[in-house]
Amino acid sequence: MDYRKLHGWDLSPEEAIKVQNELRKKIKLVPYEGEPEYVAGVDLSFPGKKEGLAVIVVLEYPSFRIVEIVSERGEITFPYIPGLLAFREGPLFLKAWEKLRTKPDVVVFDGQGLAHPRKLGIASHMGLFIEIPTIGVAKSRLYGTFKMPEDKRCSWSYLYDGEEIIGCVVRTKEGSAPVFVSPGHLMDVESSKRLVKAFTLPGRRIPEPTRLAHIYTQRLKKGLF
């Protein structure tokens, strides 16, 4: 798959923040109408201190049948800094994206979208590169305030930055911690909440696209795939 080359990656943390502040102006928060035919999940892990591994799994929806899996392993040059993970993980994701033959209608990232100090988490940032609707689903809160949803599957509450709604906190599995859902690009809060609920099977905490991407990341790390 092709993508837009919006900036280089040889940046200092200060330069990276400036890039985020410029790119955030380009984000489009719009409803996603209908249902996707193909949905992709993205997971990244770090087998070594300077080595990263990106996996993209494309699923048919609503069967969740795996259509394609691509991966990319390579050197990581940007330091780990909360709020700047796209600069650490983005280059590997884009190299994996270039290998993809099946175009997904929606891409789900294990990370943040709008729920970010500068409104540009990895789901938003990479969404601008690939120009496909994206959603961030994180296991923990990076930014924003919320009231804990009740311990009931599919219960939820809004995530706020002041009075602005920047995402949702969704209890996908009873008895488990909620996930933090926010739109990336070409997506809005309500659509991202609706789709993440639809992508998460009963008894699971993590939506199938990123859950399966994580499974294959771990298999690749162990040399089992």
UniProtKB/Swiss-Prot annotation:
Its cofactor is Mg(2+). Its main location: cytoplasm. Coiled coil: none annotated. Its EC number is 3.1.21.7. Pfam families: Endonuclease_5. GO terms for cellular component: cytoplasm. The record marks 80 as: Interaction with target DNA. It catalyses: Endonucleolytic cleavage at apurinic or apyrimidinic sites to products with a 5'-phosphate. Keywords: Cytoplasm, DNA damage, DNA repair, Endonuclease, Hydrolase, Magnesium, Metal-binding, Nuclease. It is an enzyme of class 3 (hydrolase). It comes from the Bacteria. GO terms for molecular function: deoxyribonuclease V activity; magnesium ion binding; RNA endonuclease activity, producing 5'-phosphomonoesters; single-stranded RNA binding. Mg(2+) binds at residues 43, 110. CDD domains: Endonuclease_V. Gene3D superfamilies: archaeoglobus fulgidus dsm 4304 superfamily. Belongs to the endonuclease V family. This is Endonuclease V. It comes from Thermotoga sp. (strain RQ2).
